[in-house]
Amino acid sequence: MSAKTNPEVIKESSMVKQKEMIAGNYDRLTGTKESGEKVVSTFVPGNLNELIMCFDMVNNLPETNAIQNGMRKQSGGMIMDAEKAGHSEDVCTYVKADIGMMGRGNIAPNGKPMPAPDMLLLSYTGCFTFMKWFELLRHEYKCPTVMLQIPYQGDGKITKNMRDFVVKQLKEEVIPMFEQVSGVKFDIDRLREYLKNSAKAEDDLVWVLESAKNRPSPIDAYFGGVYYIGPMFTAFRGTADAVEYYGLLRGEIEQRIREGKGPITPEGDMKEEKYRLVVEGPPNWTSFREFWKLFYDEGAVVVASSYTKVGGLYDQGFRHDPNDPLGTLADYCLGCYTNNNLPQRVELLEKYMNEYQADGLLINSIKSCNSFSAGQLLMMREIEKRTGKPAAFIETDLVDPRYFSHANVKNRLESYFQMVDQKRSGASLATA
């Protein structure tokens, strides 16, 4: 970024708040030796943060550690370390970055060593790799492990039997393990209070995501959206901090709508909205800003994305319900995006295309992420057929810098935007 653009960098109150929250959680994690707090490692989809807080345990999420290392340009060497130790090139790079991080002293972003987990909680919501990842972690740390088995929505619906099965596991396996490891007795009223906070924050998050229906969209629901979902999908859902963060964020977006502004980018306000896109798949983290710049330089705004639903489909009506504490945790896990079948995913993308008046669909296929990438070409063709809008396919990776080609992605995006322009011209001639 040039010196001329530096003064335009915008730091809003919500950004500062989120940065403080993340830094505070890492300080809490790396300070558990002094505080005596217990640590549980879990994953983002199906993350039961409200339940974890009931036992005064600190939540550590290995994916977010890999993302942090990716954005700090540190994951490449960690991945190569893991491959030298025998992990295949095809294995999820989150896993390899985590394994490599452990081999390098398991240093957190604050420069201090991460603690060993006292417990592993695997909420299985459709990603088979998570199971193998936790087998590696269990072998490394030899700590108590509990798996919450979440039935797959093969038929595209959640049944009473599925819900009852998850609640039964929570009562008979998960909660007793938490009590045993933490030494804290489960208090369902405490859980209810956290769930109330969650529902309030979820309302504001959904409002923010749906603000992209405006023209111009005041947000980028993919590149900006990954920041907006951060507190909700990680160690903060259910906290007063999350409620405050989403309240601040909503207020800022309301102001942008009043002023007719587009999204904030790393180089200031986006000046012109030329293309409205729906994006399927996670972003590339190692070249995140470079990747984003390829979009906003062309006036392309992502108005809806599937990745920002990986930790919960709140915009489809789900809210945590304090009146049914364990049942609502089951519903949450069952409804995560990666636990939906392909027809459900296609229907969601089609809905986004229509509701957000998108010009087209873009799929960012991740080389090492099978839970997202499987079936994406099929999904792309189906969306083209249903909507008549152009779709495109690019390939990158999560946190492996070897699989981000700036020139290749740039060429594909430029060709795609030309295709969108041609489609618009054809539509204009047809109606003339």
Curated annotation (Swiss-Prot):
It comes from the Bacteria. Its EC number is 1.3.7.8, 1.3.99.n1. Optimum pH is 7.2-7.5. One of its GO terms (molecular function) is iron-sulfur cluster binding. Pfam families: HGD-D. The keyword Hydrolase does not apply. Its cofactor is iron-sulfur cluster; an oxidized flavin. The keyword ATP-binding applies. Keywords: Aromatic hydrocarbons catabolism, ATP-binding, Flavoprotein, Iron, Iron-sulfur, Metal-binding, Nucleotide-binding, Oxidoreductase. It catalyses: cyclohexa-1,5-diene-1-carbonyl-CoA + oxidized 2[4Fe-4S]-[ferredoxin] + 2 ADP + 2 phosphate = reduced 2[4Fe-4S]-[ferredoxin] + benzoyl-CoA + 2 ATP + 2 H2O; 3-hydroxybenzoyl-CoA + AH2 + 2 ATP + 2 H2O = 3-hydroxycyclohexa-1,5-diene-1-carbonyl-CoA + A + 2 ADP + 2 phosphate + 2 H(+). GO terms for biological process: catabolic process. Heterotetramer composed of A, B, C, and D subunits. PANTHER family: 2-HYDROXYGLUTARYL-COA DEHYDRATASE, D-COMPONENT-RELATED (PTHR30548), SUBUNIT OF OXYGEN-SENSITIVE 2-HYDROXYISOCAPROYL-COA DEHYDRATASE (PTHR30548:SF4). Belongs to the FldB/FldC dehydratase alpha/beta subunit family. Catalyzes the anaerobic reduction of benzoyl-CoA and 3-hydroxybenzoyl-CoA to form cyclohexa-1,5-diene-1-carbonyl-CoA and 3-hydroxycyclohexa-1,5-diene-1-carbonyl-CoA, respectively. The enzyme also reduces other benzoyl-CoA analogs with small substituents at the aromatic ring. This is Benzoyl-CoA reductase subunit B. It comes from Thauera aromatica. The gene is bcrB.
